[in-house]
Amino acid sequence: MAKAKFLVVYCLFISGLCCMANVTKDINMRFKDVRQGLSHQTVNCFYQDEFGFLWIGTQDGLNRFDGRKFEVFKPDNANPYSININNIRQVCGNKAGLLFIRSLQSVTLYDMRLNRFRVLREGEVAGICYAHDALWIATGKEIYRYRNLDQAPELFFSFPSDEEDVL
């Protein structure tokens, strides 16, 4: 009898927890798409910078959303400081005004204060990350570290493998 009471109390307790877990606040959510200015319907990545801007990488450009409108960054042959890529795969930042943008073919630096882009690395890139005051770039078999963005990267690690891509 005591086991049955315990089992009933336990089941009620667990079901109460489940009900509490399903309680949510009303969230006001507005969806944005190409009709509101997003450059492409396929979104590959998001990043929120230290100023509150939401950076959205799409297949057709880099988008900055300020909460109201989009600003789209695309290659412009007339501007040597424009972004060099359209298909944005990843965005990260250093929380000091610099963004790092990865495509399949390169990594590009964007200085928000100067409103200028410049290529940091060309060639296949598997991933990027900014951590411990350095930009980390992973290729198919190696990991590079940029401590000073004006100097060549340091080869941090290389996988001893005969395979094409490890990462």
How would you name each of these model-derived features?
Residues 1-167:
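Carboxylate-rich, polar loop motifs that coordinate divalent cations or form catalytic acidic clusters
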